[in-house]
Amino acid sequence: TDMNPLLLKPSSDHTAQVVLNGRPIGNRDAYEYFRKEGREELRKEVNAAFDRLAARYNPIVMEGAGSISEINLRDTDLVNMPMACYAGADVLLVADIDRGGVFASVYGSVMLQTPEDRKRIKGIIVNKFRGDIRLFEPGIKMMEELCGIPVLGVVPYYKDIHIEEEDSVVLDYKRMQAIEGKVNVAVVLLRHLSNFTDFNMLER
């Protein structure tokens, strides 16, 4: 459980089951979860999980969750810049160009950091690029000049690498057509579906 010590499993639009070190500790709504009261206890457990891993492995690669620039949640953030600060880790900022607005997203994410946290960001990776990379090459230079941080790479959009999605939001965009002559399997999209990645093998 040290690889994912704190897990949220949505149970409604506003509440989620909180799983700490592999054991459910109750359901909390979003407001209750992000309140400072009790937050430090969760932080201690998350940090302790990192310490156990750091004692056994080097290097350790950590993945944040969501955006690093939700400044209204900065004081209670457990997984992004505060975790990098605790671990003394350098940060790579990964930007999704497929959704559009990548320049505003990257620049805003960098500039909304505190000066100390901004120094931790050592590189930018542009993810899910489609099209002719030559058209984006001037944009790479612009991004580096705007942010003062090197763009380390541009990752093409791959459709066949089968990496698990971060959360269930992606399910809203999954639409498959029935194929004649093959066994077709349909999965009902329930509003608060949990463990949805169990069905990934059926897509292949």
Protein language model regions, located:
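Flexible phosphate-sensing "switch/lid" loops adjacent to ATP/NTP-binding sites
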Residues: T1-R204
